[in-house]
Amino acid sequence: MKFSAPVLAIFLASASAQSTAELAAQIPSCAQTCLATAITGAGCTAGDYACQCGTSQNTITASATPCVISACTSEEALNTQRTTSQICALVAAGSASSPSASSSASASASSSASSTSGAASASASASSSASSASAAASALTLAHPIPNPSHPPSPTIQTNLRKKVRNSNRLTPASLSSVSSALVSSASSVRASASSAVSAATTAANPAATTAAGVKEEASFFIPAAVALFAVFAV
């Protein structure tokens, strides 16, 4: 069993007010020793109700509760809880009528107002931060939009992709070098054949010279054609 009242620890040997004395008389005898020990341990005296119901209240309650539970019946423990609560209520009512108590109440109200204001400011700051984060996320999405599969690339992008594919299918530098070497070799062979034919034509009859001239013309035609073919492959 655990007490929920603010005070379980008031032991009254004497009282300065009749109402407080009447309440003190209602505390079960089984709880008085427990309360007296807890009050002394907290640094208060038996008749110092301001101390017992003030800053030492939690200490007295924590110390007296286990003792009261073990020493009293459930009914007696409940009566102790109810009576000590009423005594502290009378102490609080008497303190509230003094100027110092009014000052304390005002300070407490001011502190509560400050706490409320601080909480409101923190809430506004958090809301502002959330708005800023949302705006930043929107700006990032606009600057770097996520591709949408339902919207195909624009015609310009498709054209660029086709160019890249077409360029990738062209001859590589190694292939172009091989083709160039083959064309040069073929041209050299034709040129050598033409030269041999011309030399033979100078010592042979006119029909042979005519044949050599024809071979030379074929060689002259083949070489430019080979160069043109090489240019086509190089594109």
Swiss-Prot record:
Residues 212-235 form a propeptide. It is a lipid-anchor; GPI-anchor. One of its GO terms (biological process) is biological process involved in interaction with host. Its main location: membrane. Disulfide bonds join C30-C72, C34-C67, C44-C51, C53-C88. It is found in: Cell membrane; Secreted; Host cytoplasm; Host nucleus. One of its GO terms (cellular component) is host cell nucleus. Residues 1-17 form the signal peptide. It comes from the Eukaryota. Keywords: Cell membrane, Disulfide bond, Glycoprotein, GPI-anchor, Heme, Host cell membrane, Host cytoplasm, Host membrane, Host nucleus, Iron, Lipoprotein, Membrane, Metal-binding, Secreted, Signal, Virulence. Pfam families: CFEM. A lipid is attached at T211 (GPI-anchor amidated threonine). Residues 18-114 form the CFEM domain. Belongs to the RBT5 family. This is Effector CFEM1. The lineage of its organism: Eukaryota, Fungi, Dikarya, Ascomycota, Pezizomycotina.
